[in-house]
């Protein structure tokens, strides 16, 4: 399963199937690597993700898995830190692209996020980035991630935030009916008719506790995700500023991506 088409054009090329009555976003008919990343001017977003991951992932990991990791976009961040690394995704196309680039350095597994093929406590650490917006049942996903982590294992999870400043202004000025202060997830079906979920930080943080995780660190990521800002200031300047504010701005939870470093406690 892959997770990250954020435009109408992208979602139009993605099939949706059902698994145990849950929607699965199938990127097999969509070249996520080329269309969404390589040809779409998202260098800033990519570097912002990498900045956060370098801060949050453990320096040394025995058995690591990148959940819904697509074609291995972030593999160069975790391969040097892991004795063994696995890339898990629903899309066979994404996994084929990963194997072409990384070969035997990265183990690839295809499957359903709601019922992964992994053993209880198999991994010491995991990463999940740009995935939560496709989950019909986030709690079930978190319980599955908890199951495959060993006791005390680390999970670095990115969450699509509904409580951003632009969304607040759109709501205040009646340009959007989506209430960013409502703690329930918003389902933005105008982006994807089968569901495109954004989450209130309080909602996901309660879910983390409910599903056996403790929050150890939080970062505010992609704080300057704006075509206008990228055009005016350029990627290099924005990333320099991004590095400076990811930690300090975490307390207000206003960025489109919120990164959490979690520990499995039960």
Q: What do these predicted regions represent?
A:
Residues 127:
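A conserved beta-strand element that flanks and buttresses the S-adenosyl-L-methionine
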Residues 170-172, 202-206, 216-266:
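A C-terminal cap/extension of S-adenosyl-L-methionine-dependent methyltransferases
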Residues 139-154:
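A short glycine-rich, Lys/Arg-flanked "PGG" loop and its adjoining helix->strand segment in the class I
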Residues 65, 69-115:
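Class I SAM-dependent methyltransferase SAM/SAH-binding core
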């Amino acid at each position: 399963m892959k997770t990250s088409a954020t435009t109408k054009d992208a979602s139009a090329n993605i099939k949706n199937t059902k698994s145990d009555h849950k929607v699965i976003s199938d990127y097999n008919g969509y070249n996520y690597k080329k269309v969404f990343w390589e040809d779409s001017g998202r260098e800033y977003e990519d570097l912002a993700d990498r900045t956060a991951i370098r801060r949050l992932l453990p320096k040394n990991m025995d058995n690591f898995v990148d959940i819904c990791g697509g074609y291995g976009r972030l593999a160069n961040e975790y391969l040097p830190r892991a004795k063994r690394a696995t890339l898990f995704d629903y899309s066979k196309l994404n996994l084929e692209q990963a194997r072409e680039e990384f070969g035997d350095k990265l183990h690839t597994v295809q499957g359903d996020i709601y019922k992964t093929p992994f053993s209880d406590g198999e991994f010491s650490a995991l990463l999940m980035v740009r995935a939560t917006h496709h989950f019909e049942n986030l709690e079930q996903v978190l319980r599955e991630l908890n199951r495959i982590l060993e006791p005390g294992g680390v999970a670095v999870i990115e969450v699509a935030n509904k409580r951003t400043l632009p969304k607040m202004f759109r709501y205040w000025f009646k340009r959007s009916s989506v209430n960013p202060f409502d703690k329930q997830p918003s389902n933005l079906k105008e982006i994807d008719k089968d569901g495109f979920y954004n989450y209130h930080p309080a909602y996901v943080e309660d879910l983390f506790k409910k599903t056996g995780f403790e929050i150890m660190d939080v970062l505010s990521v992609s704080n300057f995700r704006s075509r206008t800002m990228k055009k005016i200031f350029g990627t290099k300047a924005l990333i320099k500023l991004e590095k400076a504010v990811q930690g300090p701005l975490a307390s207000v939870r206003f960025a489109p991506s919120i990164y959490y470093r979690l520990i499995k406690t039960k």
